[in-house]
Amino acid sequence: MPAKYHAYLRAWVDALARTGYRAGVYCSGMLVDEGHGVTIITADDIRSNLGKRDVTYFVYNDACPPAPGCVVPHNPPPPSASGIPYAAVWQFAQSPRRKEFTARCAATYNADGNCYAPGDTAHAWFLDLNSATSPDPSSGRGGRP
């Protein structure tokens, strides 16, 4: 990513920290071909440019595997199964399904390409599925009101 983007992120994370908040970023945990033999994972790029700043990473990686697809397991896979060991949240299914990444788990999605909650027979609610390391992975304001 451009240096200006990283400078903005550092300033934003620092500004939040000064007011008692911890930043969280929603970003790709998927390998991307940047061309000319260069590949990146956005989460790794952000993390390496933020240094030791305390940031919560909410990554998406709906590619099957590692994503299980549109399934609601009793014990969902941990965020580290996304391929990003420091992820606090992993979005492993999206609606509508991204066909280029989910061909191996297409059968887990509805025929219309969306993911629905079990029991949603009316298909009223598009569903994205996530797992997290805790019930409150961003820790809110650290307990402050």
Task: Locate predicted features.
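Distinct, well-ordered alpha-helical segments
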Residues: 5, 34-46
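Second-shell loop/turn segments in exported
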Residues: 1-4, 13
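Functionally critical loop-and-helix segments that line ligand-binding/catalytic clefts
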Residues: 41-145
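Aromatic-lined carbohydrate-recognition surfaces of secreted/lumenal glycan-active proteins
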Residues: 16-36
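Short, solvent-exposed polar/charged micro-motifs at secondary-structure junctions
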Residues: 1, 35-37, 99-101
